[in-house]
């Protein structure tokens, strides 16, 4: 199967190594002669093809993104909730989960977990054109090439494959953890290249731990502040807390979130303090056990490396 797109809005498909071609020129909602910016075939289904279009040279900055699941017999728009003025440059499909898609647009990047029915924008990507996307399949990294701002890498996006609407309704969810290698981190000196020396930070050493919290983990005092703030915004009367409530707030310990690492025997080898805010979070375990220093909440130092083996996180 060979699929090509042209600069005048055509998509041509060949099933005989280029000896003959089917022409496709009508796509739902896409203007005639729109520039085809990208064409990809699915890694999971021979009849599934994704095409993105660009019509900004005619003053139309809308995103145009379509898919066929029957080899081109019918096409469906999957632009859905991509911003109206954020036209699409490129699209890639996850190599393991066909529901996961990524697009690069004029103002950033989006991802979908439902084959384009809905999209979410990456929040920490600069507002710049993302002209090309590539997936490093061995590491599950997403590499983005921007126009004028270099390359950006999303390290190990594999939790997105597991992410779903039911997870958002849970109190908490811990995503699957990948195996990793243990090694001694080197600290080489810079070479004599002066101002030409450039390096980009690697992911932290160790195992990435990803989790989702359905709500902020709050103390009684923080919860009362939230309720009172909402009442103030609505113009409602705010009752002064009773002495019993104030005493309970004062005695309560500040709630914390810890990721607990255990070995194959169930013994705890490390606890890692993590964010207690609502949403998706990442943390790293550096493959070391507890510090040998005096125990305290402020002591976040690590101890010696743990022996290779099977470990769990809770």
What are these regions (language model features)?
Residues 31, 268-302:
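Glycine-centered tight-turn motifs at strand-turn-strand junctions
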Residues 44, 126, 202, 252, ...:
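Surface-exposed coil/turn segments at beta-strand junctions on protein surfaces, enriched
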Residues 259-263:
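Conserved aromatic beta-strand anchor motif in extracellular beta-sandwich/beta-rich domains
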């Amino acid at each position: 199967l060979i699929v090509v797109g042209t600069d005048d809005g055509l998509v041509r498909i060949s099933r005989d190594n280029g000896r003959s071609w089917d022409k496709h020129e009508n796509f739902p909602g896409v203007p005639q002669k729109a520039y085809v910016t990208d064409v990809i075939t699915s890694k999971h289904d021979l009849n599934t093809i994704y095409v993105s279009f660009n019509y900004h040279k005619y003053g139309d900055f809308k995103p145009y993104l379509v898919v066929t699941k029957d080899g081109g017999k019918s096409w469906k728009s999957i632009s859905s909730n991509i911003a109206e003025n954020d036209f699409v440059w490129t699209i890639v499909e996850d190599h393991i989960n066909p529901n996961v898609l990524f697009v690069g647009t004029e103002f950033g990047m989006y991802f979908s977990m439902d084959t384009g029915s809905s999209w979410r924008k990456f929040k920490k990507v600069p507002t710049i054109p993302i002209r090309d996307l590539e997936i490093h399949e061995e590491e599950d990294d997403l590499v983005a090439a921007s126009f004028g701002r270099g390359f950006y890498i999303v390290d190990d996006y594999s939790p997105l494959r597991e992410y779903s609407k039911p997870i958002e309704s849970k109190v908490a969810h811990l995503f699957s953890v990948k195996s990793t290698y243990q090694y001694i981190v080197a600290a080489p000196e810079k070479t004599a290249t002066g101002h030409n020396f450039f390096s980009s930070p690697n992911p932290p050493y160790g195992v990435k731990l990803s989790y989702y919290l359905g709500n902020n983990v709050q103390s009684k005092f923080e919860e009362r502040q939230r309720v009172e703030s909402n009442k103030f915004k609505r113009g409602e009367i705010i009752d002064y807390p009773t002495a019993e409530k104030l005493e309970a707030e004062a005695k309560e310990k500040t709630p914390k979130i810890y990721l607990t690492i255990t070995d194959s025997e169930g013994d705890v080898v490390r606890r890692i303090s993590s964010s207690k805010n609502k949403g998706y979070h990442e943390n790293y375990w550096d493959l070391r056990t507890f510090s040998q220093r005096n125990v305290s909440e402020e002591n976040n130092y690590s101890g010696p490396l743990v022996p290779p083996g099977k470990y769990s996180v809770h």
